[in-house]
């Protein structure tokens, strides 16, 4: 696969793969030979290391290691992400052709490491989301510009798009070809490394100015820029993952059929079900990263650091409101839960609480507020708090009492984190950042507590006295008043947001 990239850089037959000969004088441990080595192991992974001469930077050799159970990992990825799109993925036993294609894609990624390329987790952000559903476009260009991203498969595509394997699998992309030219192209005209550096810098600047698909980010997806993330797709996480949720729902509708075992066991069902729920969590955390971060650019004509637009962050909060804070009960059908032993109430509660903790973390509020002071286009802190409140504090009128149970838990969790910011010494705020209590953020949080109190009073008045919801709102109101008394003292009862 990589030979096309090397041909563009001026080399033919740069990489040749041969079967290991039956020669007793050759050893896999011999540093003269670069090999793909099979490891009989339950580990679900593969890796491509390289040995480099520190004096010159020359890559001396590589042993790509292929654990046996990486095939199990590939099967889970492909069924969960592309089962609704490719009928070959609707069984626990993939045919040799499909598994061979999956192995080829991972092998190409590991070869990329062996020839010097790092992960580029920003590569997939160069593709507009709707292009991932354009059959002609995505089959011609691929769903990511680099196989060195963790872009896996095109989970954005929908069944009605009728996209083939060419538009679902990663491939050597335009970024990869550019990176090989940068690293390997022979430039005999240069004798002075300093002059070469100046010319190459000018060439790269010109190239990047005209083609942002060649952008590289080396943070392994662990920085503050939401464009650089592991296992995401497209230029908008919210739009992409909304499509991903649609496909996960299709997987759940068919999971019992696709994982059926003749012996009546449910080990395969449990394996795939765990992967579906893990995929949903990935979608959630990818969206959450679009809140409170910043863009980091090493592209010409752009600010090195720039703020995330308000609209993008607001879109992320609304996505979380739809797909997490309205409990994803579709992910826990009784016929699956009863066969796998998963505890929906515990898992949904823990996931919702974890994301609330991220949204109301002192560092998050500080980032949003400090950014708003520097840019009128960024998210104002009071707007942010109001939007998060709207996403979480939904009325307790859902036909499902289970959903109402989750909403009550969310109310209590939310109030607990607000208390932690009002009273940093409380159990929920023991580690609250001093930057909160010593800045104007404290005033915004106090104002927000007034909003919570007003909303709780309204819902309490609208509830039937003595029923569960009435007791819930009455308890919340008592807690709000205790928080105020502990912070403001005895005058808390007379204090009001409109006085």
Predicted ranges, named:
Residues 1-114, 139, 143, 153-156, ...:
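Metzincin-family zinc-dependent endopeptidase catalytic domain
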Residues 111-127:
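Catalytic Zn2+-binding segment of zinc metalloproteases
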Residues 38, 54, 66, 119, ...:
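Generic structural "secondary-structure junction" signal
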Residues 124-499:
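Conserved catalytic/binding loops enriched for acidic/polar residues
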């Amino acid at each position: 696969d990589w030979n096309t990239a090397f041909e563009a850089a001026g080399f033919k037959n740069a990489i040749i793969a041969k079967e290991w000969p039956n020669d007793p004088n050759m050893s896999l441990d011999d540093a003269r030979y670069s090999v793909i080595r099979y490891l009989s192991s339950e580990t679900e992974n593969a890796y491509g290391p390289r040995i480099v001469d520190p004096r010159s930077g020359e890559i001396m050799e590589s042993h790509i290691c292929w654990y046996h159970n990486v095939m199990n990992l590939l099967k889970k990825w492909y069924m969960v992400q592309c089962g609704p799109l490719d009928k070959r993925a609707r069984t626990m036993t993939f045919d040799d052709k499909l598994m061979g294609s999956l192995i080829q894609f991972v092998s190409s990624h590991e070869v990329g490491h062996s020839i010097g390329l790092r992960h580029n987790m920003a590569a997939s952000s160069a593709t507009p989301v709707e292009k991932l559903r354009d059959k002609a476009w995505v089959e011609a260009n691929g769903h990511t510009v680099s196989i060195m991203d963790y872009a896996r498969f095109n989970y954005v595509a929908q069944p009605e798009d009728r996209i083939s394997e060419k538009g679902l699998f990663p491939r050597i992309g335009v970024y990869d070809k550019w990176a090989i030219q940068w690293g390997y192209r022979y430039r005999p005209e240069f004798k002075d490394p300093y002059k070469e550096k100046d010319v190459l810098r000018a060439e790269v600047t010109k190239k990047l100015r005209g083609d942002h698909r060649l952008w590289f980010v080396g943070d392994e997806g662990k920085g503050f820029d939401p464009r650089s993330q592991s296992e995401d797709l497209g230029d908008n996480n919210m739009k992409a993952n909304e499509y991903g949720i649609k496909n996960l729902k299709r997987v759940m509708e068919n999971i019992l059929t696709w994982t059926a075992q003749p012996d009546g066991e449910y080990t395969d069902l449990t394996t795939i079900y765990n992967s579906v729920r893990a995929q949903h969590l990935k979608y959630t955390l990818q969206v959450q990263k679009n809140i409170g971060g910043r863009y980091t650019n090493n592209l010409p004509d752009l600010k090195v650091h720039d703020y995330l637009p308000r609209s993008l962050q607001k879109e992320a909060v609304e996505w979380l409101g739809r797909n997490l804070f309205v409990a994803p009960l579709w992910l826990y059908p009784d016929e699956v839960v009863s066969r796998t032993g998963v505890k929906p109430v515990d898992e949904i509660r823990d996931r919702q609480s974890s994301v609330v903790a991220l949204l109301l973390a002192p560092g998050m509020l500080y980032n949003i507020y400090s950014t708003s002071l520097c840019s009128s286009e960024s998210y104002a802190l009071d707007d942010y708090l109001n939007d998060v409140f709207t996403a979480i504090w939904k009325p307790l009128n859902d036909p499902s009492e289970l959903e109402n149970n989750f909403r009550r838990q969310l109310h209590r969790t939310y109030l607990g984190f607000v208390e932690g910011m009002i009273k940093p010494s409380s159990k929920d705020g023991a580690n609250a950042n001093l930057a909160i209590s010593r800045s104007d953020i404290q005033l915004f949080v106090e104002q927000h507590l007034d909003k919570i109190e007003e909303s709780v009073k309204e819902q309490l008045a609208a509830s039937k006295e003595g029923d569960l919801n009435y007791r819930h709102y009455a308890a919340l109101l008592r807690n709000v008043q205790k928080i105020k008394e502990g912070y403001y003292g005895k005058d808390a009862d007379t204090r009001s947001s409109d006085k």
